[in-house]
């Protein structure tokens, strides 16, 4: 029996959520369609009813994940709140649920230019949020500083996940968090 339109919509959402998580945890190229469908609790045969290809799935899943981050509660608070959340041991440990750019940056950079539009839009959105936080704190928006702050956040998360020294990993997060929030 064919799923109802509502079931099909729910299935598609589960596929997108599962793919976004698995891609961020393992990398796009390391995750196959079978793993995504199994993780979503669906059969492989249903995949092509939702997506043209794995590339189509990757593009949509990553856009979905990045859009969810820009709409997240963390972005509705203050810069200090965002820094505490983004530059935290919990976020560091949760690559599958965290920042797509920090989890997949080098892999995203190797995507064809035509497929990097959602990533570019996401980064522009993060920069805009940084500029908005500058305004909220009484400062004049400084795009250059906003770009540097976004790069600092992403870079700190990447480095903290890369090193094999837990104390250094924590120090990286804390140093950038303190610098960005003015607590240094």
Model features per residue range: what roles?
Residues 14, 18-56:
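Helix-turn-helix
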